Regions:
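Multi-pass membrane proteins that catalyze or facilitate reactions on polyprenyl-/lipid-phosphate substrates
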Residues: 1-236
């Protein structure tokens, strides 16, 4: 049970780190959403905040559906499958090296809702352990022609509903809080928050410089190591 509480704290720390880093985008999106409720057509065509808010909603639908129906089946995924998923993620990330040749969409309004749905489906695939959520969503966004900065920002904006949903699903499994060691939660929360801030800044910096594909090498190496470890254990 303490492990479950620790996992929840990790999710919450990551959630808070994302909010801090992308607070301006979040505030503009929330503001645009409520203003757009008064005039949907005009806001959808002219208000960037509302447009992004609507895009976030659309992109969140696939992961909500997949997560709801498959969540209980994914916790015991075999180790070699996780290794293979990491290798798949790494391969896709490496392909983003050539996205500079793809015509870039000039602004948010050039991004179609079909594009957004594809990014949402990419996020849904990340319910499978070993598939990187940000890796998949940013990669697909780049393949679809979103500029690097917005691809990263949008990827982490749509992560917020997904992380919040994961928190809710985890909280329902908590039973007697009195039996938990709160120190686990505090350590997990602080650690994930601090490292989340550092990781987000580092990733966005690499992305803006066109070096996002470098993370593909990391995923490939870890994936191969996990798979080889599984083979070694299985043989012995």
């Amino acid at each position: 049970e303490n492990i479950l509480l620790f996992e929840i704290a990790l999710h919450f720390g990551t959630f808070l780190a994302t909010i801090i880093i992308f607070r301006e985008d979040i505030l503009n999106t929330i503001k645009g959403f409520f203003l757009g409720l008064k005039d949907f057509k005009n806001a959808n065509e002219n208000d960037e905040g509302f447009r992004i808010a609507f895009m976030v909603i659309i992109a969140s639908i696939p992961v909500a559906i997949v997560g709801f129906f498959l969540e209980k089946y994914l916790s015991d995924l075999p180790l070699h499958r996780i290794g293979l998923n990491l290798i798949i993620t790494g391969s896709i990330l490496l392909l983003t090296k050539n996205t500079d040749k793809i015509p870039i969409k000039k602004d948010v309004f050039s991004t179609t809702y079909y594009n957004v749905l594809m990014i949402g489906i990419a996020q849904a695939l990340a319910v499978f352990p070993g598939i990187s959520r940000s890796g998949m969503t940013i990669s697909v966004a780049l393949f679809l022609g979103l500029n690097r900065d917005f691809a990263g920002r949008f990827s982490f904006l749509i992560s917020l509903p997904a992380i919040f949903g994961a928190l809710i699903l985890s909280l329902k499994n908590l039973k007697d809080l009195k039996s938990f060691d709160i120190s686990y939660a505090v350590i997990g929360l602080i650690t994930s928050f601090v490292f989340g801030i550092i990781a987000l800044k580092f990733l966005m910096s690499f992305l803006r410089k066109g070096k996002f594909f470098h993370f593909g090498f990391y995923c490939m190496i870890v994936g191969i190591a996990v798979y080889l470890y599984f083979i070694t254990v299985a043989v012995n």
